[in-house]
Amino acid sequence: KKAAGAASTKYMKIAKKMGAELVVYDNVTNDVYMQDLVNGRTDVIVNDYYLQKMAVAAIKDKYPVKINDGIYSNPYSTSFTFSLKNKTLQEKVNKAIKDMKKDGTLTKISEKSFAGQDVTKKTKVDYPEIDISDVE
């Protein structure tokens, strides 16, 4: 099968590991991915679940596609990188995140930003880990 995605992403590495033929895109919109999927140029788009969920919701009337809610792999988290010289900023950011989590602001931002999904809470999905350390 042909998997669509951006070069060198972990998603394309997973597709390659699973035996897909890679169709690599460079800086294109979701519209291009979806059009190629519908036209048969590709068979699947391998990408971040939440980003794809939003993309499909945005174009559902334009393209007959659907996200497979039953396939998950390789969970990830986001980090902030601070200069070691700026401990004060790190402390302020950590406090702000803690406060926003406590008062529900992070959940509201998440639901607004991720098509109604609360990404601040761990999912109940048992993610399989696919080792891609050997994939170029």
Where in this protein do the model-derived segments appear?
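Residue-level signal for nonpolar/aromatic packing positions in well-ordered secondary structure
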Residues: 37, 43-45, 80, 93, ...
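Ligand-binding clefts/hinges and TM-proximal coupling segments of bilobed small-molecule sensing domains
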Residues: 10-18, 23, 95-136
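Bilobed "Venus flytrap"/periplasmic-binding protein-like clamshell domains
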Residues: 1-34, 49-53
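Short, charged, surface-exposed secondary-structure boundary motifs
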Residues: 14-15, 32-41, 77-79
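Periplasmic-binding protein-like
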Residues: 59-95, 116-136
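Short active-site oxyanion
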Residues: 1-2, 42-43, 96
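A ligand-binding cleft/hinge motif common to bilobed small-molecule-binding domains
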Residues: 13, 43-74
